[in-house]
Amino acid sequence: FVVVAVFWIAALVGAEYLATRRAHRGTIPSPVVGAARGVAALAFGAVLFQAAQSLQVPAFEPRLLGLWSLGALLQAYLFRGLAPLVIGLLTGGAWVLASTLASATDALSVLQALFAAGIIGASVAVLHHRFVGEGPGRPGGIPTSFAAPWRTVGSGLTLIALFAAAVPQLTSDNYQVSTQLVVILVLAAIAFAAALILCRGRDRWEPLGALVASLIGMVLVLWEAGADPDQVGAADWGHAAFAVASYVLVAGWIAVLGVLRDEDWLTWIATAALVIFTTFQSFAVFAQIIEGAWLFILL
């Protein structure tokens, strides 16, 4: 544990030393600083897991991911490092998924947590554009590039949740509200309200889009269809058609958002999600309705 902790501290101090040299002399390339900060954020996770092992805490405990995320996010905002922010958001998303899956007894609460995390990502992203970007009079502000990781992770979680919500076999049976779900929903409500009140213009459309996607997902889960795979009725037709149309619209919105924000990752993620979703729907849902090559072509 001591060796890992010393390595983490050395990486953290070394990264900021390199950042200081670059700021004053311009001799250290920025990728080196970013890589060093990323190594420090990864090493912090190693410290946590090593400490957990020493204390006989199971390595698969989701709280370790949550602590890792908090530490990486703290480093990112203290030292304005993009690499720690990406690591913090990825581990935070993994914590939301792992912790809800471990504690939930139903599908609806898991999807609600993922949709709420997507709303948080979209809301925090536009708040970065509104207040904390660098510019005249704010040379020490948080870089506007911090908005892109929040938007990307939030959009990814929204697409994953909507993908799962479109599966007819997922229902609201045994629905229970846990303390963790309440906390995530409250945080999402606060971030959403702050984005609507404080942001201006088209920035407001991003959290609204995430909210609309969440509401669509709830409708798909609560809509009971696909109970009998051998008999396809009007409800199954309607559910499948609504799911495909909704996913196309949401994925298209995220792809367009990637163009408007000049963030290629969003467009790539939305395109890949749409292809995977269409393929899955073709063979898992629509196979009982339309057969042959026309199935995929139509979708």
Predicted regions and their residues:
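Alpha-helical multi-pass membrane segments and their bilayer interfacial helix-loop junctions
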Residues: 1-299
